């Protein structure tokens, strides 16, 4: 049992029965939202979304490894300096200690809607420290604290059809890990559901659609989205450039 900064309540793993109940609730909520969307369209109305991200963000490199409270295997897996995102008031919003070396790619997924076909699902991309509450890609408030960032693809099961432009996500899990490398979808999802009814997630946008002068860097690439772009080395000597959305959201219904 452990605590997250900004909360006085201990975090405990949900029971299997509770997690199944949560998944049933999410299904009901999805069907309710879908019916509402169809009804609205039939009435000739269009949905409108308010752009809430009016801040400007900057990036700086901060020397020093991740928090000492992390397991040694995690601390050794990531860089000994962080990419720090500063908000419009020049205050630190988040620190990101990215993996010093990702596993070599296996079993590329070339399905439409997948921008990062050679990223191994479930792999840890970074350690994140949020300094203050911040909304994720689904506009969910995420509390200050320390998290692991894992790569996960939105399931192609019909339940998320048309929800977002791309299926690639950086999801948050608890700051503990039996494995930092690739792992199955269900295992990663269960870890993410330990934190919230729906996984906290930031979008991974195609890197070639995010133009930046130098890496690592941060830029606004749409009116309401900001992304950190950088290249990460791999064990086989290759590298992969990612663009992780750190501000702004996209949820089509």
Task: Identify what each model region corresponds to.
Residues 110-114, 125-133:
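N-terminal post-signal-peptidase region of extra-cytosolic proteins
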Residues 118, 159-163:
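Short consensus segments that form the blades of beta-propeller domains
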Residues 28-40:
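Bacterial N-terminal signal peptides
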Residues 123-125, 142-144, 165-167:
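Extracytoplasmic
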Residues 145-152:
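A short tyrosine-centered beta-strand micro-motif
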Residues 45-116, 172-253:
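Primarily secretory-pathway and cell-envelope proteins
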Residues 5-6, 13-30:
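Bacterial N-terminal signal peptides that target proteins for export
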């Amino acid at each position: 049992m452990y605590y997250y900064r900004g909360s006085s309540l201990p975090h405990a793993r949900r029971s299997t029965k509770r997690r199944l109940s949560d998944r049933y609730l999410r299904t009901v909520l999805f069907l309710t939202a879908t019916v509402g969307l169809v009804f609205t369209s039939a009435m000739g109305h269009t949905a409108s979304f308010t752009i809430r991200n009016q801040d400007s963000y900057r990036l700086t490199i901060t020397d020093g490894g991740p928090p000492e409270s992390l397991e040694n295997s995690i601390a050794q897996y990531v860089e000994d300096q962080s990419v720090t995102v500063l908000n419009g008031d020049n205050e630190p919003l988040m620190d990101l200690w990215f993996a010093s070396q990702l596993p070599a790619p296996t079993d590329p997924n070339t399905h439409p809607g997948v921008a990062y076909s050679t990223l191994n699902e479930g792999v840890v991309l970074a350690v994140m420290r949020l300094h203050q509450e911040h909304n994720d890609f689904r506009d969910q408030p995420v509390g200050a604290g320390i998290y692991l960032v894992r790569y996960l693809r939105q399931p192609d099961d019909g339940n998320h059809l048309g929800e977002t432009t791309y299926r690639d996500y950086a999801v948050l899990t608890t700051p503990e890990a039996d494995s930092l490398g690739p792992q199955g979808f269900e295992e990663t999802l269960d870890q993410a559901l330990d934190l919230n009814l729906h996984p906290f997630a930031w979008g991974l946008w195609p890197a070639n659609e995010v133009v930046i002068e130098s890496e690592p860097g941060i830029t606004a690439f749409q009116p309401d989205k900001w992304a950190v772009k950088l290249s990460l080395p791999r064990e086989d000597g290759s590298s992969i450039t990612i663009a992780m959305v750190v501000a702004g959201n996209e949820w089509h219904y």
